[in-house]
Amino acid sequence: MFYHNSSIFHPTTFFLIGIPGLEEVHGWISLPFCSVYLVALLGNVTILLVIKTEKTLREPIFYFLAILSTIDLALSTTSVLRMLGIFWFDAHEISFGACVAQMFLIHAFTGMEAEVLLAMAFDRYVAICAPLHYTTILTSRVLMGISMCIVIRPVLLTLPMIYLVYHLPFCQAYIIPHSYCEHMGIAKLSCGNIRINDIYGLFVVSFFVLNLVLIGISYVYILWAVFCLPSQDARLKALSTCGSHIGVICVFYIPSVFSFLTHRFGHKIPRYIHILVANLYLIIPPSLNPIIYGIKTKQIWEPVLRAFIKK
């Protein structure tokens, strides 16, 4: 079960329990999980197809939306397929390398989603606070630079987690009371000192907080600019362009904050609640994001409606 690596013992496999305490109803729990995953697949693929086929959707906000949908597809697939394997086929065992790989992908894609939301906030800030300079500020070169930051920064923040996990000793513990692999879930199985893992985890969380603060600052300027507009119609029109983005921010950050608080301070909360919240944090945003943008954005739902009418 364990192999030796430079005086550090690693298990050859981990055992993912799924949702501790609810093992007998895993089959029933899988139904909403599978449904939400299918909604995420259908919704995000639809968004990508509409943006690709509609020549009018070439504004930067739709470019960021396409990136968001791509990340949502990757994040939901990385997490939900492993969960369904546990629920349906009792595929609890996962190799050490595969577990670390899943940990890296989940944390990296989650970080990328936070970066995209920040980029979208910047887009809305420029569109409302400096509309005459919108096309000169958000040029193709700037969009390319932002896209690289969206990918590179989360990857660089997540890579040290691999090093930290590989340098932990694992004595006899290999059972993870979770349905997927994440950094602290693996670290807590170690019989060594995980203080550096804990500190680094908080360091990574601080970047999510920083992004949220920057988004908040951008919306302070946006609201100031909106309320300076002369007519109520102009104010409502400006605010309506931010509605979808605000909805997506809430869908992403509210479950993540709740998950963080239950993990840090909810010691009296049953373990299965912790795991369910952590699962919802990964699967709900990818399924709701395309719905929010599809309903609120006329340029998105009109082509979809035309396609159904033709059929």
Could you describe each region identified by the protein language model?
Residues 1-311:
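Transmembrane helical core of 7TM receptor-like proteins
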